[in-house]
């Protein structure tokens, strides 16, 4: 496929699960980051086709990382999907206000995740 996805989560288990789903079912190249600060620097260097990012993380949360990524000219149009256990309306609204393209809740359904990513990656 040739697409690159940046996976961002402070949980090693979640990163491994997401990476396994994407590699086995899509062949996407996956790069990872453990928090929002790391995500910004990795995104600038790696130039991913899409960012899949947790919200609640140490050092910098996903909302703030999303806002800062949108300030980077190279990342302004990169699709960002936020992932969290919280699905309350105000929390989802905060996600969209931070600049994300979409928002999904955990636990992640593999089929739903792949369908969503393929939609944003034009597949």
Describe each PLM feature range.
Residues 12-31:
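Two-component/phosphorelay signaling modules centered on CheY-like receiver
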Residues 32-50:
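Acidic, metal-coordinating helix/loop segments flanking the phosphotransfer/catalytic sites
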Residues 57:
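Receiver (REC) domain active-site loop signature in two-component systems and cognate sites
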Residues 86-87:
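Short, conserved "switch-loop" micro-motifs in signal-transduction and mechanochemical regulators
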Residues 108-117:
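C-terminal output helix
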